[in-house]
């Protein structure tokens, strides 16, 4: 029998065990990580050779949650796991982002990482174990990989950082931050926060990086005893002669092209130069270099041109200095029939953002492995190919769109009103209509404006900005509001969103090692300046939320009844509530605690439904006079309905002062009568009287 090799370490309040050698032995690397009964299996397989003509690194990362891990059977007809959930997609990206930069340049072999959740403790999210497991599996596989990485979640409560807080602890934490990196460098940060200062955010990153060393050390110890021999892979030898020839043919033109400030014109010019250079080096040439080889060198020329200019203090591609935000144009209320809308344009990046208000029935039901729950706030980000002037696949939501949408959602959620204060379900959709960098942050700005245009009482406006970095040795430049090319050719993508009072979301992806605390400090401070500049323009366009929601949005009324009366409102088989909704044109939602939300396109309908519910749930008062309707005649009296669902007995002796021989001589079915309640008993039976009113009137 195979023997498992294990390494155990303490990580915050958790005990973590790394295990390899028993399961999935045919994979290139396989590690099981157990964190307090949350168990994940990470496997890595790499092709021994790159495909001919391959010109990019084909890394795929898939994180998969199995329902059996939480002792559940999937819903749906087929009773098996289906397409990836949003949580699975986001966690796959979380694993991918810090490991991708650690594969060597020129390594184009296909690599597949699969992480499977096998057991779930509901208090321990599987994402941090998954990142550690993927890092460990890569490290023991022998595949060229400049790791390992560690990963940590950091919370913040009562002025203290929390290492790997539980799900319960996160409910009271003002911060939920995930940081990943190597022993010497931070590579990735993903977070949401409740208006924390830049200093607290930076401190959390540094704290997480310090604490993750325990995970990195444990992985290194596992590699020492269980690691496979390192691959004898060497990067392709540089073709210095070809590099010199490409420079000779293209460098001067590339430098000139990067003085064109319009993105489309610049892109077209660079494409012309690239095609011309390839043709000059390949047409009719024996043993000509491959197009991919020439393209790689051409990209190096582009990067070198942009980077050297910025580090030398020259203007950026579009003529700005390092701290200037592109021109901003804002319009709100741009779509006539939507509940809230905004068109936010920053340079050549534009987002049309729409907010829609719905009822509780519109909440998104999430069937997660830990259990079903509902989301009252959704943000969807769409990035069609026309936004960059290209053709491409359309209609299928891509991983990037899901990731950008979640980042924008994180930025805005802290400023939303609580459900008890604003009971609407909220959906925000960001349609990216133009893109030249920072479209997710444009979605944050446009989303904040659209929500306020819809009348959502946001606590404050939220703005977002994307920062970049160019670093060469000890020289570096932090760039405010980066363009697409600056993101592509730079060393860091650093997105910060927040209010005037603090940060609500932070995302960082670093492509190189050696980013110091000081550099991150400069980037955060510069991002703060840019954010405040954008917030001022947003507040000039729409300072506070509209006083009321759109005329096209449903009207909501909230009320509370005695929980024992819920069945009276619902009625047998739902008959009462169905009839009530049809008559008043409303949607009525009832919670187990007696909370009721009434929604309607008209305020009148909602008020009418509320009054009817108050009648249904009203307590019958002894001595009170009611306007009732005779519903049935009996030999010994009549049944009179005095409130919805509440009937009482009008005994023959209580109809008139004289003797009544035939009840039908005095009252008819359907007749409206005034009656007084004489008594109610413990079983809810009600005795009524008409005679008592006759005597009172006579008196």
Swiss-Prot record:
<dbReference type="InterPro" id="IPR015848">
    <property type="entry name" value="PNPase_PH_RNA-bd_bac/org-type"/>
</dbReference>
<keyword id="KW-0694">RNA-binding</keyword>
<dbReference type="InterPro" id="IPR012162">
    <property type="entry name" value="PNPase"/>
</dbReference>
<dbReference type="GO" id="GO:0003723">
    <property type="term" value="F:RNA binding"/>
</dbReference>
<dbReference type="InterPro" id="IPR004087">
    <property type="entry name" value="KH_dom"/>
</dbReference>
<dbReference type="InterPro" id="IPR012340">
    <property type="entry name" value="NA-bd_OB-fold"/>
</dbReference>
<feature type="binding site">
    <location>
        <position position="487"/>
    </location>
    <ligand>
        <name>Mg(2+)</name>
    </ligand>
</feature>
<dbReference type="GO" id="GO:0000175">
    <property type="term" value="F:3'-5'-RNA exonuclease activity"/>
</dbReference>
<dbReference type="InterPro" id="IPR036345">
    <property type="entry name" value="ExoRNase_PH_dom2_sf"/>
</dbReference>
<dbReference type="GO" id="GO:0000287">
    <property type="term" value="F:magnesium ion binding"/>
</dbReference>
<dbReference type="InterPro" id="IPR001247">
    <property type="entry name" value="ExoRNase_PH_dom1"/>
</dbReference>
<keyword id="KW-0460">Magnesium</keyword>
<keyword id="KW-0963">Cytoplasm</keyword>
<feature type="domain" description="S1 motif">
    <location>
        <begin position="623"/>
        <end position="691"/>
    </location>
</feature>
<keyword id="KW-0548">Nucleotidyltransferase</keyword>
<feature type="binding site">
    <location>
        <position position="493"/>
    </location>
    <ligand>
        <name>Mg(2+)</name>
    </ligand>
</feature>
<dbReference type="Pfam" id="PF03725">
    <property type="entry name" value="RNase_PH_C"/>
</dbReference>
<dbReference type="InterPro" id="IPR004088">
    <property type="entry name" value="KH_dom_type_1"/>
</dbReference>
<dbReference type="Pfam" id="PF01138">
    <property type="entry name" value="RNase_PH"/>
</dbReference>
<dbReference type="GO" id="GO:0006396">
    <property type="term" value="P:RNA processing"/>
</dbReference>
<dbReference type="InterPro" id="IPR015847">
    <property type="entry name" value="ExoRNase_PH_dom2"/>
</dbReference>
<dbReference type="InterPro" id="IPR036612">
    <property type="entry name" value="KH_dom_type_1_sf"/>
</dbReference>
<keyword id="KW-0808">Transferase</keyword>
<protein>
    <recommendedName>
        <fullName>Polyribonucleotide nucleotidyltransferase</fullName>
        <ecNumber>2.7.7.8</ecNumber>
    </recommendedName>
</protein>
<dbReference type="Pfam" id="PF00013">
    <property type="entry name" value="KH_1"/>
</dbReference>
<dbReference type="Pfam" id="PF00575">
    <property type="entry name" value="S1"/>
</dbReference>
<keyword id="KW-0479">Metal-binding</keyword>
<comment type="similarity">
    <text>Belongs to the polyribonucleotide nucleotidyltransferase family.</text>
</comment>
<comment type="function">
    <text>Involved in mRNA degradation. Catalyzes the phosphorolysis of single-stranded polyribonucleotides processively in the 3'- to 5'-direction.</text>
</comment>
<dbReference type="Pfam" id="PF03726">
    <property type="entry name" value="PNPase"/>
</dbReference>
<dbReference type="GO" id="GO:0006402">
    <property type="term" value="P:mRNA catabolic process"/>
</dbReference>
<dbReference type="GO" id="GO:0005829">
    <property type="term" value="C:cytosol"/>
</dbReference>
<dbReference type="InterPro" id="IPR027408">
    <property type="entry name" value="PNPase/RNase_PH_dom_sf"/>
</dbReference>
<feature type="domain" description="KH">
    <location>
        <begin position="554"/>
        <end position="613"/>
    </location>
</feature>
<dbReference type="InterPro" id="IPR020568">
    <property type="entry name" value="Ribosomal_Su5_D2-typ_SF"/>
</dbReference>
<dbReference type="InterPro" id="IPR003029">
    <property type="entry name" value="S1_domain"/>
</dbReference>
<dbReference type="GO" id="GO:0004654">
    <property type="term" value="F:polyribonucleotide nucleotidyltransferase activity"/>
</dbReference>
């Amino acid at each position: 029998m195979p023997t498992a090799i294990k390494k155990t370490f303490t990580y915050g309040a958790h005990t973590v065990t790394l295990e390899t050698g028993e399961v999935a032995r045919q994979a290139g690397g396989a590690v099981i990580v157990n964190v307090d009964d949350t168990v994940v299996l990470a496997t890595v397989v790499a092709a021994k050779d790159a495909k001919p003509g391959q010109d990019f690194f084909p890394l795929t990362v898939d994180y998969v949650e199995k329902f059996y891990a939480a002792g559940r059977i999937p819903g749906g007809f087929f009773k098996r796991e289906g397409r990836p959930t949003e949580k699975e997609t986001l966690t796959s990206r979380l694993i991918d982002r810090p490991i991708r930069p650690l594969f060597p340049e020129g390594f184009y072999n296909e690599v597949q990482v699969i992480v499977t959740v096998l057991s779930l403790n509901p208090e321990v999210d599987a994402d941090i174990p998954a990142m550690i497991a993927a890092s460990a599996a890569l490290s023991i596989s022998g595949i060229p990989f400049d790791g390992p990485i560690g990963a940590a979640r950091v919370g913040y409560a009562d002025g203290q950082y929390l290492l790997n807080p539980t799900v319960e602890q996160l409910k009271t934490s003002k911060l939920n931050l995930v940081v990943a990196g190597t022993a010497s460098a931070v590579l990735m940060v993903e977070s949401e926060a409740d208006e924390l200062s830049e200093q607290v955010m930076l401190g959390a990153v540094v704290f997480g990086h310090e604490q993750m060393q325990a995970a990195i050390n444990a992985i290194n110890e596992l590699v020492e005893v269980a690691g496979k021999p390192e691959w004898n892979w060497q990067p392709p030898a540089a073709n210095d002669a070809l590099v010199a020839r490409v420079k000779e043919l293209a460098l001067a033109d590339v430098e000139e092209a990067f003085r064109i400030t319009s993105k489309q014109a610049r892109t077209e010019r660079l494409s012309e130069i690239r095609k011309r250079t390839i043709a000059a080096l390949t047409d009719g040439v024996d043993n000509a270099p491959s197009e991919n080889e020439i393209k790689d060198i051409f990209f190096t020329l582009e990067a070198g041109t942009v980077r050297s200019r910025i580090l030398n203090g020259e203007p950026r591609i579009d003529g700005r200095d390092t701290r200037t935000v592109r021109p901003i144009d804002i319009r709100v209320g741009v779509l006539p029939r939507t509940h809230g809308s905004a068109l936010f344009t920053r340079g050549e990046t534009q987002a049309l953002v729409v907010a829609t208000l719905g009822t509780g029935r519109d909440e998104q039901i999430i069937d997660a492995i830990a259990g079903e729950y509902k989301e009252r706030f959704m943000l969807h980000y769409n990035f069609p190919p026309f936004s960059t002037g290209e053709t491409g696949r359309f209609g299928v939501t891509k991983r990037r769109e899901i990731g950008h949408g979640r980042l924008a959602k994180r930025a805005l959620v802290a400023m939303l009103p609580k459900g008890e204060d604003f009971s609407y379900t909220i959906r925000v959709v960001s349609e990216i209509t133009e893109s030249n960098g920072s479209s997710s942050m444009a979605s944050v700005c446009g989303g904040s404006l659209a929500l306020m245009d819809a009348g959502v009482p946001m606590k404050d406006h939220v703005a977002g900005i994307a920062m970049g970095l160019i670093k060469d040795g000890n020289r570096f430049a932090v760039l405010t509001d980066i363009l697409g090319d600056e993101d592509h050719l730079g060393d860091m993508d650093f997105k910060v969103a927040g209010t005037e009072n603090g940060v609500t979301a932070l995302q960082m992806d670093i492509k190189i090692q050696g980013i110091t605390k000081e550099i991150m400090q400069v980037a955060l401070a510069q991002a703060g300046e840019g954010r405040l500049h954008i917030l001022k323009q947003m507040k000039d366009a729409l300072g506070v939320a509209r006083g009321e929601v759109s005329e096209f949005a449903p009207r909501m009324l909230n009320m509370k009844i005695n929980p024992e009366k819920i069945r009276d409102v619902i009625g047998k088989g739902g008959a009462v509530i169905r009839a009530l909704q049809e008559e008043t044109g409303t949607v009525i939602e009832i919670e187990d605690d007696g909370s009721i939300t009434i929604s309607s396109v008209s305020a009148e309908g909602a008020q009418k439904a509320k009054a009817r519910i108050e009648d249904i749930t009203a307590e019958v008062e002894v001595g009170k006079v009611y306007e009732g309707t005779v519903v049935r005649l009996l030999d010994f009296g009549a049944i009179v309905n005095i409130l919805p669902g509440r009937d009482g007995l009008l005994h023959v002796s209580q109809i008139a002062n004289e003797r009544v021989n035939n009840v039908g001589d005095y009252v008819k079915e359907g007749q409206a009568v005034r009656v007084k309640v004489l008594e109610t008993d413990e079983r809810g039976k009600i005795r009524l009287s008409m005679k008592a009113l006759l005597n009172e009137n006579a008196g």
